[in-house]
């Protein structure tokens, strides 16, 4: 499957950050179609994905069918916030999930992280950045907020976490593409603005927008990690950019 350019850049950064961390047990919250889980599995991790939408759950299981068959991975179609851990995990990660919660739900999510992480575990969040760039995609996806570095770090700190690392990702590529992205989303998905926040959130992991989330096969000649490696280096160079549309954050308990 051909991934969007922003997703490719995010996964490249994640893999680079985790390359020196010994693989262990992970949980991914809101797996969508399972691309981030696939990245972790390829690095030797084993774990569980949680997904509210049954169609996305099936897609994630199919995407990672070899790991499912070998017992290294499963997707549970349940609400993670209401689930107790079988055992602590070494890595707890979510991509474009936290912004779907209101303030109370956001606090509950971060408290649940405390119950799931092992004593030396690491939490990772990828969330929308640059509040100035709020747009149609936030509306149709059921977002409550976009984060600034300051607001994200303040929120984590206030709830007993310490930010170990924070970086802005996909800048400047996603910013250059944003007007086209907004146009494509408005044409394909504007009617979702009339849906409830819950329904918009549920559908956010299974979007099909030609030219944004789905591409003809030949585009894979360009949208791949080899061709996009220079843009990965550029995003690292500009990881301090305030207008970066994605924030990557690693966090641990404040007393560690």
Predicted regions: what they are:
Residues 123-145, 154:
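Short, glycine-/aromatic-enriched active-site segment of Class I SAM-dependent methyltransferases
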Residues 145-160, 166:
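Short alpha-helix
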Residues 47, 163-164:
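Hydrophobic anchor at the start of a short beta-strand
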Residues 1-95, 109-110, 240-256:
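Conserved N-terminal segment of class I S-adenosyl-L-methionine
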